[in-house]
Amino acid sequence: MGIEQVIDRYCEAWSTKERAKRAEIVNEVWAESGTYSDPRSDVRGREALVGLIDAANVQFPPGIEIKRTSAVDAHHNVARFAWALSGEGISMEGIDIAFLSDDGTRLERVIGFFGPLAPEA
């Protein structure tokens, strides 16, 4: 699986409603002790990530999707990509920075940013 496929599967985990399927995807693409942080969260490990996604899915209306909206820009097993969350009555965009394992098959760290960058003042 290439870097783009790993990232797309990771985004799919956020959109998946079934916990068992979500956990399966996370186990496939997430390093055992991988970390995720964004302005609201900071978790370590697969189970913690699944729990975070569980909590997020409770807050969002049914049918939300998170999809990658840019090409994956990557070098030296570090990647950045834009994403968008959309669904009934909600939309959000952001950028994630992802650090991958040496073989490029698992995410070891993801740092998420919400919203577009503000122009320089």
Stretch-by-stretch model annotation:
Residues 1-29:
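Short acidic-aromatic low-complexity motifs
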Residues 10, 30, 36, 81-83, ...:
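Aromatic side chains
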Residues 54-121:
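A beta-strand edge to alpha-helix "cap/lid" segment located at domain peripheries
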Residues 21-76:
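A solvent-exposed, acidic/Ser-Thr-rich amphipathic alpha-helical stretch
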